[in-house]
């Protein structure tokens, strides 16, 4: 997800890290420090604030990206139907895990179930290759139909796999594809 975001070179990422989606922001921050992208990364005071940053950037015409998990998704849930209802596109990655009960962080789909009726398009990726592919396609789809999109995948099982993924070698080819 982070490599695709780097290639897309979003305008803004409003974020508040939560396990197991934390690595997405960490890798983007590392790539930013090495000059690999121009994404304005805005750390929020919480997930609700991160959702507000993303919504505001999207209403301002920005190409926007975020990532969260579990209770982070629940904290931002109030804003999801607003964004889909006003038809502002963005990409939100959800590394799915259990909603704390009690304080479990095991992988399951209880968090994504809360997002099913928010009006967001949801693509579920079964492996890191599809996470990458869906992120590249996701922004194109979101901007074409004017709806935000969620790329969901299993927390830990998929989010932390260190498996080779075939990536598009030239960032320019990604830009040409998404427009």
Map each language-model feature to its residues:
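Conserved thiamine diphosphate
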Residues: 106-156, 167
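Context-gated lysine
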Residues: 6, 32, 63, 106, ...
């Amino acid at each position: 997800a982070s490599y695709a975001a780097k290639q897309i070179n979003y305008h803004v990422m409003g974020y508040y890290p939560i396990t197991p989606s934390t690595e997405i922001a960490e890798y983007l921050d590392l790539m930013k420090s090495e000059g690999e992208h121009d994404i304005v990364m805005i750390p929020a005071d919480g997930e609700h604030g991160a959702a507000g940053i993303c919504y505001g950037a999207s209403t301002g015409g920005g190409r926007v990206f975020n990532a969260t998990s579990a209770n982070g998704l629940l904290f931002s849930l109030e804003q999801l139907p607003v964004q889909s209802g006003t038809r502002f596109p963005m990409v939100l990655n959800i590394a799915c895990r259990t909603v704390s009960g009690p304080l479990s962080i095991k992988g399951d789909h209880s968090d994504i179930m809360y997002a099913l009726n928010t009006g967001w398009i949801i693509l579920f990726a079964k492996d890191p290759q599809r996470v990458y592919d869906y992120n590249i396609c996701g922004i194109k789809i979101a901007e074409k139909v004017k709806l935000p999109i969620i790329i969901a995948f299993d927390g830990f099982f998929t989010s932390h796999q260190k498996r080779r993924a075939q990536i598009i070698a030239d960032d320019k080819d990604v830009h040409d594809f998404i427009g």
